[in-house]
Amino acid sequence: MKSITKLLAATGGILCLLSSCDNNMNPLLTDSTLPYGAPRFDKIRTEHYLPAFEQAIAEAKAEIDAIVNNPDAPTFENTVVALDEAGSRLDDVAGIFYNLLEADTNERMQDIAEKVSPMMTEYSMYVSLNEPLFARVKAVHESGVALEQDQATLLDKTWKSFVRGGANLGAEDKATYSKLSEELSLLTLQYGKNVLAATNAFTLNLTEEADLEGLPEFVREAAVETAKSKNMDGWAFDLSAPSYGAFMKYSTRRDLRQKMWMAYNTRATEGDNSNIELCRQIAELRLRIANVLGYATYADYALEERMAKTPQTVNEFIQKLLEPSLPAARAEVKELYEYARANGFEDSEIQPWDFGFWSEKLKDARYSISDEQLKPYFRLESCIDAAFGLADRLYGLVFEERTDIPV
């Protein structure tokens, strides 16, 4: 282990010299002094991510090289544990970036993700297709060394990650697998960008109060704020869940509900943001990757390490669900349609953009309760208190607010 430490120290010095230590001020590349090592969200800026990924990947590769170049015979500690601990800074940077990308994405973050994706894929291939590294893992795996249960689990997962990542492939298949994986990562990112762009492109802007019939006051107030944020007059409804869901549930304007439903359910199906061809390409790439790795379908590959294990198990489970649930669903649709017909609905069949509206009406008629009445009981603060209180009662966990950690 001393030889690894020396090599890492030397490599770290070289990396610092090469970068002139410009990243010393990057909060993603400096150890947090906050409690529990919490990220410095108050200091992290969008421009910090790309250089952080570049340096973190370089450091992670150096850590991998140190394992490979260790002159000592492969052991669980100097190979499997060392590999598990390698790339910890990269894990931190990626964890922060990708969580924010999912929770609060924008075009700048999407552009960074597009640049980072091939970098991360290349690093993944650097590890999974690294023959000397795999040889060390294989030696430990085949050594029959006695391990504790958690150690044995780590070894098994490490071994499988290499095998499922193409380590046993020949040189030509490795090159094919690497190329396909990079293509897939870029197409998957583009798919997400198209969905985001298509979602942001649609807004239903209403300027006549008559068009708001049926909408509760809290929905109207939110629509005013949405309009202001988009520099529009009147009331604006977009395809975000709170705005879309409320409109579909309360609006009496069936034509506008249909417009909203069509916009939501046909996102990214036409124009520059169309995902139709991307879906075909992604499905084809997944199949080719699975075939290269020796699986009949991508489902066989994806399910192997999951609870279901096989596509057959999934299909059987779905069939078991269908048998009791399909008749019940049809009965509920029939009941909803009959209620709607009795209350002024004139169409011969109920449409997807009618379900939310008439379900809310039926619930109100049957139970004399609406979401608006329940709203005061489900304020965010109340829900947080309830969740923490339940954790305390069930598991004895106590949560205390920290004001010294930026969010």
Predicted feature residues:
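Short His/Asp/Glu-rich catalytic/ion-coordination signatures at enzyme active sites or charged loops
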Residues: 33-48, 97-116, 137-179, 238-277, ...
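Active-site-proximal, well-structured secondary-structure segments within enzyme catalytic domains
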Residues: 154-155, 193, 198-238, 285, ...
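Intrinsically disordered, proline/serine/threonine- and acidic-rich regulatory linkers
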Residues: 4, 23-24
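C-terminal motif of bacterial Sec signal peptides marking the signal peptidase cleavage site
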Residues: 17-20
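Bacterial N-terminal signal peptides that target proteins for export
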Residues: 1-9
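N-terminal helix-rich structural modules
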Residues: 24-215
